[in-house]
Amino acid sequence: MQDNPSIQFDDQRLAKRQQLIEAGVPMYPHEFRRSHTIAEIRAKYSQAGHDPSSDQVITAGRLYGVRDHGKTFFADLRDETGRIQLYIRKDALPEGKFQMFKSSIERGDIIGVTGRIFKTKVGEISIFVDDIILLTKTLCSLPEKFHGLTNLEKRYRQRYLDLIVNEESRETFRTRSRIISLLRNYLTGQGFLEFETPTLQPLYGGANARPFTTFHNFLGQKLYLRIAPELYLKRLVVGGFEKVFEVAKNFRNEDIDTSHNPEFSMVEIYQAYADYTDMMKLTEGIISSIVHEVTGSYEVAFEENTISYKAPWTVMSMEEAVRTIGKVDIFAHDLESLKKIGKEKGVDGIDDVHTQREMLVLFFEALVEDKLIQPTFITDFPVENSPLAKSHREKEGFVERFELFIAGMELANGFSELNDPLDQMERFEAQEEKRRLGDEEAQMHDYDFVNALGYGMPPTGGVGIGIDRLVMLITGNTSIKEVILFPSMKREVTTPADEEEPSSV
């Protein structure tokens, strides 16, 4: 039964399960009707006296912390809403139930109880148990009570166990759920409509990234997991929807580290008749509102810093940031001088670029990004790095694009969206040339999208906000694995599929 090391059934628990079956005790009843959750009991009976009330409550949860006192037991029962103490006495239970509890029910099992509420002498709200029903006999032992589950890899691989034993993890994911709800509410309150666009796409685009590839047998064609929903959402703007968004799962075949996971969540937002300055204001409003709603403050601690989300946030161009923070005036030096300075400062990739504008991006990434602790919009990116953004109205060779940085992490990316179909075609052709030269992250030429622009897209602003990183910042978690329920990890056990050659398609 336990040939696979992923299955960790406990032999003693299996034996107790068999004893219960032989005694005719149902292991897994089909349902159990509660009269109250634990939080409801605590709220309703907070003024209970020391003698059990005449009111009967029926509740259920997972059993923790069993304390044996011979003919009585104390135990902790927990459900999603909270914890309550059980007082179990032999002479108060139906015949045989106390012995069943003592011999076969243990920490981690899920039980239902019927009883009356009272307060102990120290003021602890408790249930005087009149009956116990076993709802689920667990076969795996929980980690030791006082040390919990501290192995990081096990916490990520067995998130279900992490959630059982670590309240901090449960609270993180409660907060994540609330953040996403608040995000949706904010946007719909501003008149945006939520849409769903394809996850399997015949072309990948919307960002520079290496895609995951698959094959559709019936269609007989290669498909890609989306790296961004951008081009489909902008088609909706062409079609007449003026304020659109999608909370999307995106997939990028990239490295895994503390701020990157191959499968991640973003919200992408597009608004007709707006530009990148409008999208910066929208982004600022969304994030500051969510932070205040969740934490009750605009000041949130992250690592050793206190981040202030109170508007207005800092806005500076990339050129200004490199000059003032990185201490390099890019356009005051020629390429050879910049290469020399870059090597002295440890800037990577400088031998692979051929313009000052491309140098600007490399210097920014190496010298500035991790110093942007407070919320900062970096604006005006080189055209070479932004194939979907509109050319800057004042700066030749640049586009109207911004990225938001907080605590040294990129949190959002937005544009005045390119809506000139001929300009877009030229940008795609430049990306295709990069692909021919071996750049796996360059975008594909989406002819249908160019055709859509030919029908006319109004001036449009767009932004994508990383949900996982936003949750990290609000909850104080420094690893993206802490805020994704089931992060990507290398499989522990090799399977035949791992030994197959990668498909040529």
UniProtKB/Swiss-Prot annotation:
Cofactor notes: Binds 3 Mg(2+) ions per subunit.
* Binding, Mg(2+) 1: 403, 410
Which UniProt key words apply to this protein?
Aminoacyl-tRNA synthetase, ATP-binding, Cytoplasm, Ligase, Magnesium, Metal-binding, Nucleotide-binding, Protein biosynthesis
Catalysed conversion reaction: tRNA(Lys) + L-lysine + ATP = L-lysyl-tRNA(Lys) + AMP + diphosphate
Top-level taxon in the UniProt lineage: Archaea
Task: Identify the Pfam families for this entry.
Answer: tRNA-synt_2 (PF00152), tRNA_anti-codon (PF01336)
- Cofactor(s) essential for the protein: Mg(2+)
Task: Give the quaternary structure.
Answer: Homodimer.
Concerning HAMAP family, the annotation shows: Lys_tRNA_synth_class2
The identity of this protein, by name, is Lysine--tRNA ligase
Q: Which organism is it from?
A: Methanospirillum hungatei JF-1 (strain ATCC 27890 / DSM 864 / NBRC 100397 / JF-1)
